[in-house]
Amino acid sequence: METMLFSPYTIRGVTIKNRIVMSPMCMYSCDTEDGKVRNWHKIHYPTRAVGQVGLIIVEATAVAAQGRISSRDLGIWSDEHVDGLRELASLVKEHGAKIGIQLAHAGRKSEVDGEIIAPSAIPFSEKTRTPKEMTKADIEETIQAFQNGARRAKEAGFDIIEIHGAHGYLINEFLSPLSNRRQDEYGGSPENRYRFLGEIIDAVREVWDGPLFVRISASDYHPEGLTVKDYVPYAKRMKEQGVDLIDVSSGAVVPAKIRVYPGYQVPFAETIRREANIATGAVGLITSGLQAEEILRNGRADLVFLARELLRNPYWPYAAAKELGTTISASVQYERGWRF
């Protein structure tokens, strides 16, 4: 049986062998707290490549030490990180997958020691620290950090870069009126709140000509926050700037109760794809091959991003192929167990 899920997808000359993407998920495994790749990463990611995932996106990787979510996050703020990342990328590609990396800055949600920064001096919650409002110099320095991170990702041999603009981290904090109360050109109007992300995209594009994704939170789940309709013009602008795909998640810019169910974020990806005319990735409680195939067949997204399901089962593509009545190849070492 021919399937969409196991059909190839090409972006800017990079061909992903199927539409299955391992979503970036923090592993909090840098036990040396220096941001460097550890043995855990060198086992965790290649295992999913052996399992026939088409694209693996490495977890949120901090472009600045102060921009880590935790002290155990991966980093790309120094040239010293490149060798470990290069080895990781090579291991994944050795097993037939493409590899991406998510460039991130946690902003006010950083839990590292010392000063934290954000567009405005507003804490995430009553239980978290109040960040310092970023100066123009802070903004320029952070944009440069994203560009430097992209340059290092290129040196390390990554196929795809994703900019993390979701989940209440720094870029998302600029986009949302709930966290951005600035009175200058980086706050106020939707255009001004987009400016920080727009300048990051331009800076990354100066050093990176490969596929570029941006992850967004398409709903703030708050009456005064952003909705998917607000993100349509943002997505159009991203496309004009050379972004190739929007990875559509939601929430986490402020504390909120979110009603989750299988595929609960898929309608957001569908709306962005249809109304902004840009490729999208759907993510959020996608757990079966039939569910993934439906999303693709009905034009709701171009790629499916799996997170927790790939933690539970690194060989999910095999199970999905069996469910859909098709066959996929296995690594030679595993062929005895993968016969359909």
UniProtKB/Swiss-Prot annotation:
GO terms for biological process: response to toxic substance. Substrate binds at residues 28, 164-167. CDD domains: OYE_YqiM_FMN. GO terms for molecular function: FMN binding; NADP binding; NADPH dehydrogenase activity. It holds the Pfam family Oxidored_FMN. Its cofactor is FMN. Belongs to the NADH:flavin oxidoreductase/NADH oxidase family. NamA subfamily. Catalyzes the reduction of the double bond of an array of alpha,beta-unsaturated aldehydes and ketones. It also reduces the nitro group of nitroester and nitroaromatic compounds. It could have a role in detoxification processes. This is NADPH dehydrogenase. It comes from Geobacillus sp. (strain WCH70). The gene is namA.
